[in-house]
């Protein structure tokens, strides 16, 4: 296995870098290990479910009106109890409100996402709040920087949170220019502890991707500010093999979304909470929360997780979705190093007849994580889970669509780092039309993927098996 090198591309998808990884691993081992909560009760259906609560611009709907909304959605997809069971379970495991009246737009590739976000920035009149794991000093990052500085000069308040590790090789001059342009900057958990204004924890990273313009439109998903999203990943080709080097050069296949409506305020709260936790300054002024009217018919829940969380809502939501699915669960993830409870939930769903399909990348910018994920293939395939690896473009999307009505898009990978160590952000969407678009995108990715069968998988070479074994023991820190 080639050792990761300290280049911009080696941190493009996540935070793992050549020299930083062993330092962080040692630091973590010396300071103790967090663990995920026992969620066996979710998998066994033993959760004390609560009646769903739907929030609107006019307040909380009555139980009767809430049930009517859910019944109408269920009727569109036929016989499924994903709404009756999963929504009730999710209500019990998350404190985030389920908000009605939202317009959601699926952004299925890098260029369309960049164009949509740049267009939104140009319309900004009051404020721009941007939170990103990576912001590069390449042509894409410079274009964003130019526009942010231009809007600040026009009187727009601009606040930017970037992760210290994610921006490890972005030159300091890039941020100096933004600061000189009047932009408020927060470097999340600086690598240098002397720069930290609050509690220093190098192992905790801000992996969220969030843009909010004027408190009225939000963008979230898996897309960072990087040149790998500057060209389309949807051009199909004949080449079946790729390498880690391709991950540094090719376009990345990712998924983002645009949200308008009342739930934007919930995303705004998450941004402001991160700002407060990092700086100690509370920016929850009225300017960030304009009156919002209904823009569509999607129910959306904004789920934010942190390393010091108590409810593990994103993690529990994935387990709940798998445990309550009736027909299918279709997942994509860039990095796969799950705990055993997620694995068991996948296996149990497949064994009760649910069509569980997962698309992974066939090559990665982090070879260690690729092999760690593959070490779970045999166990999943034996249980009936269908596994695919996407060719050509580096798959970085973190999505799920369940039973044609429940979807999620966000920054959370199905790995221990996302569930335990990072600040992550996911949107959960209850909307049949949006789920149809999500499923169509999944099927398009499926056409550009190779299925991994149990028979073919067991014929892989000894060298690959050794790599899987070697990295599996490090799964907690990957």
Where do the PLM segments sit?
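C-terminal motif of bacterial Sec signal peptides marking the signal peptidase cleavage site
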Residues: 29-32
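Sequence-pattern detector for short linear motifs
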Residues: 11-12, 19, 211-212
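Sec-dependent signal peptide recognition
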Residues: 17-24
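N-terminal secretory signal peptides that target proteins for export/translocation
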Residues: 1-15
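Charged, low-complexity intrinsically disordered terminal segments
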Residues: 34-478
């Amino acid at each position: 296995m080639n050792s990761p090198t300290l280049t911009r591309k080696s941190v493009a998808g996540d935070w793992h870098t050549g020299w930083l990884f062993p330092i962080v691993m040692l630091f973590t081992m010396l300071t103790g290990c967090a663990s995920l909560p026992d969620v066996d009760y979710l998998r066994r259906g033993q959760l004390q479910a609560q009646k769903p609560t739907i929030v609107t611009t006019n307040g909380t709907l009555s139980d009767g009106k809430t049930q009517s909304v859910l019944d109408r959605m269920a009727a569109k997809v036929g016989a499924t109890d994903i709404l009756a069971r999963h929504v009730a379970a999710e209500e019990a495991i998350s404190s985030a409100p389920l908000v009605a009246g939202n317009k959601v737009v699926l952004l299925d590739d890098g260029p369309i996402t960049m164009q949509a976000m740049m267009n939104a920035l140009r319309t900004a009149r009051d404020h721009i709040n941007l939170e990103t794991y990576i912001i590069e000093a390449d042509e894409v990052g410079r274009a964003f920087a130019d526009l942010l500085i231009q809007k600040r000069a026009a009187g727009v308040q601009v606040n930017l949170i970037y992760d210290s590790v994610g921006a490890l090789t972005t030159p300091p001059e890039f941020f100096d220019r933004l600061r000189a342009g009047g932009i408020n900057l927060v470097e999340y958990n600086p690598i240098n502890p002397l720069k930290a204004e609050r509690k220093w924890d190098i192992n905790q990273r801000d992996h969220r991707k969030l843009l909010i313009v004027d408190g009225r439109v939000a963008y979230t998903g898996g897309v960072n500010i990087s040149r790998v999203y500057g060209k389309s990943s949807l051009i199909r080709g004949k080449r079946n093999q790729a390498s880690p080097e391709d991950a540094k050069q090719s376009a990345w296949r990712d998924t983002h979304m645009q949200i308008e409506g009342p739930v934007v305020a919930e995303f705004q709260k998450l941004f402001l909470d991160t700002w407060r936790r990092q700086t100690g300054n509370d920016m929850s002024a009225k300017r960030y929360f304009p009156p919002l009217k209904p823009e569509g018919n999607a129910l959306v829940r904004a789920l934010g997780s942190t390393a010091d969380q108590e409810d593990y809502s994103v993690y529990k939501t994935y387990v709940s979705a798998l445990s309550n699915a009736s027909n299918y669960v279709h997942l994509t993830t860039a990095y796969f190093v799950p705990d055993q409870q997620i694995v068991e939930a996948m296996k149990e769903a497949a064994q009760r007849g649910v069509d569980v399909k997962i698309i992974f990348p066939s090559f990665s910018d982090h070879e260690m994580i690729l092999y760690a994920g593959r070490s779970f293939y045999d166990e999943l395939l034996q249980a009936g889970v269908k596994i695919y690896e996407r060719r050509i473009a580096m798959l970085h999307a973190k999505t799920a669509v369940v039973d044609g009505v429940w979807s999620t898009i966000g920054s959370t990978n199905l790995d221990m780092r996302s569930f335990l160590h990072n600040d992550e952000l996911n949107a959960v969407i209850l909307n049949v039309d949006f789920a149809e678009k999500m499923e169509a995108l999944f099927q398009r990715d499926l056409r550009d993927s190779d299925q991994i069968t149990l028979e073919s998988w067991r014929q892989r070479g000894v060298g690959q098996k050794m790599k899987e074994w070697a990295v599996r023991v490090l799964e907690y820190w990957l």
